[in-house]
A protein has these predicted regions:
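Metal/cofactor-centered catalytic core regions of large enzymes
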Residues: 2-595
Length: 595
């Protein structure tokens, strides 16, 4: 939608406005509006906007809470199973039901397959194109020349002698590695369907557990595919390490691209059935037993790993969003089940009333709200870093996870992969990086693929132990209460995911899901704090060699895509005519845009 960025007093007259709307090779409708200082080669200003309205929190009201997994999975056509899983966790708490261990291991296996599938296809078939030969040649021919001369340090592991060979292998559709990654995505999708029935809207997930019929053959079929993926990881991790390390060497200062203050959120993933009873009063304890540790990370340090603290600190701010304020609306929850006060800005108390209007970057400009985490003094604009960097950072720093295949050390995560068809045992170690930036977000995605594969090996072993012991039940009965307050915490592929439920008279009175997109894509809030996309792009240096006339914005795109943006389609709304100051480039990759 056309729009004009606001003018400011004393603004440099040589700033060039450049807009990318929609951003390609992501999911959904995301626009990035910038002002670029080509003289000093940096982004001076950035606004992130989405032209879609999601109405799930409205039409969930009055529904049977047992239907919430099936309804919420339709929020997204990419990570719908993450929503379904989180809804199951939420209703388990509301109904007071504890699923059998085998059911939990099956859910963990399904979610592990989802991480492997989605991170793989995004890393090497979507964001990977930003680093392919075609893109580098067009934007940084000097870097391409260096790549042709640069030996790949781990060529023996991945088979590509020069860095330029890796870039060529990432070319869309023609690249060898690009095509290989597509094949692996098919395998991992099959793995998911073995556990949860259908991708991406599970047919077997249900409050109380899962309806999958567990047999040794099902786990054998899963494991056969998993071992192929494990072998693939032994190639993928060193390949990406070589590629990303090269960019630091070829472009000194590239660590500043997409860099922001380390403010990371991770809500934890993969429940441990030996500890998780889904009771709110014990949530802090069983949350710490997850196989990905929940945490809020501020300036690189863990400030809490308690899901109760995480829940109570959530605030949904407005400021630049197209919604009515609900400060004086109904208060659904005054205290949590432990007696702690609950703020009116908490998702339990949110009332969603859309207020469509013309996009105005000086006022309201997006349908995304501004979730913040209140630490008692500041409303922190946490990001997920696309998911993996927050998960690995939180798990590494806490040092709680140790399952043999994966071990958190306090400063790193060790990933131990067993012998496969053609490769021996391999140990990878992800170390907490110096920065939260574009390159490190992308690097973490690769390591978390390996982490997920290693965790899946452990989950398979645990599931088979249940089978061999004769404990084959996967679901527990429950009764829907007349009144309940509940929440569920999980990690969607792209990061933090929480569902917040209030039941009255046996029906849903209020339901608010908070996936990673509102956290990452949030706009400036009532205090003027920019959201993570905006913050990461603002002041990012420009390394692209093209001038304004042929500018593609590859550094900006790398910064944005490193978050793995996902703004799936809801209700599309056109909000006025506006005026285009100047659009220099719209990256449609060969497609002709019809006006």
């Amino acid at each position: 939608m056309p729009a004009v960025l606001p003018k400011h007093e004393n603004e440099k007259k040589d700033l060039v406005e450049m807009n990318w709307d929609p951003i390609t090779r992501i999911v959904g409708s995301l626009g990035i509006y910038t002002k670029i200082d080509f003289k000093n080669k940096e982004v001076a200003e950035c606004y992130s906007t989405s032209s879609i309205f999601r109405g799930y929190s409205i039409f969930m009201q009055g529904k049977d809470p047992r239907d919430s997994p099936f309804i919420t999975s339709r929020i997204c056509g990419i990570c719908g199973d993450n929503h379904a899983t989180c809804a199951v966790y939420t209703t388990n708490m509301a109904f007071g039901v504890h699923p059998p261990s085998l059911g939990e291991w099956i859910i963990n296996l399904g979610e592990a397959a989802e991480y492997m599938f989605d991170h793989n296809i995004y890393q090497d078939n979507l964001v990977g194109v930003d680093f392919c030969e075609q893109m580098v040649r067009e934007t940084n021919p000097g870097v391409w020349e260096k790549a042709q001369k640069a030996d790949a340090p781990h060529a023996a592991d991945h088979g590509y002698r020069k860095i330029s060979d890796i870039m060529t292998a990432l070319n869309p559709f023609s690249g060898e590695f690009y095509r290989e990654a597509l094949q692996m995505s098919r395998l991992t999708r099959e793995m998911f369907c073995l556990m949860e029935g259908r991708h991406v809207h599970p047919s077997t997930l249900y409050p109380g557990g899962i309806g999958t019929v567990a047999t040794v053959q099902v786990f054998t079929d899963y494991l056969a595919r998993l071992m192929k993926y494990v072998e693939f990881m032994k190639k993928v991790v060193p390949l990406h390490d070589d590629l990303f390390d090269f960019f630091y060497e070829a472009l000194p200062g590239y660590e500043k691209v997409g860099q922001r203050r380390v403010l990371l959120g991770c809500w934890g993933s993969w429940n441990n059935p030996h500890f998780c009873d889904y009771q709110y009063r014990t949530m802090a304890e069983w949350g710490r037993k997850m196989y990905v540790t929940p945490s809020v990370i501020v300036d690189g340090k863990v400030v809490t790993n308690s899901l109760v603290d995480i829940n109570l600190g959530m605030r949904i701010l407005l400021g630049s969003s197209f919604y009515e304020d609900w400060q004086n609306a109904e208060n659904f929850v005054r205290e949590d089940p432990l007696g702690n006060p609950v703020d009116q800005r908490h998702p339990w108390n949110q009332t969603t009333t859309p207020k469509p209007q013309k996009r105005d970057f000086g006022d309201k400009y997006t349908w995304v709200m501004s979730p913040r985490w209140f630490d008692g003094a500041e409303y922190l604009a946490l990001d997920t870093g696309g998911g993996p960097i927050a998960r690995l950072w939180a798990t590494a720093a806490n040092g709680l996870v140790d399952i043999g295949y994966v071990k958190a050390t306090g400063s790193s995560v060790q990933i131990n992969l067993p012998k496969t068809a053609t490769k021996g045992e391999v140990t990878f170690e992800w170390k907490i990086p110096k920065w939260s930036n574009a390159i490190e977000r992308d690097r973490a995605r690769t390591y978390f693929q390996a982490y997920s594969a290693a965790a899946a090996l452990y989950f398979t072993e645990q599931a088979l132990k249940e089978m061999y012991a004769g404990r084959t039940t996967t679901w527990s009965e429950f009764t829907v209460p007349e009144e309940a307050v509940a929440c569920g915490f999980h990690e969607a592929v792209r990061g933090v995911l929480s569902h917040h439920l209030v039941i009255r008279k046996g029906k849903i009175a209020n339901y608010h899901p908070y996936p990673p997109t509102p956290w990452n894509a949030s706009p400036r809030d009532i205090y003027g704090t920019p959201g993570p996309y905006e913050d990461a792009v603002q002041n990012t240096p420009i390394f692209e060699e093209n001038g304004p006339d042929k500018f593609k914005g590859v550094d900006i795109m790398r910064a944005v895509r490193s978050f793995d943006p996902c703004l799936p389609c809801g209700v599309h709304m056109f909000l006025g005519d506006g005026k285009v100051l100047e659009t220099r480039h719209s990256p449609m990759f060969g497609a002709v845009r019809q006006e």
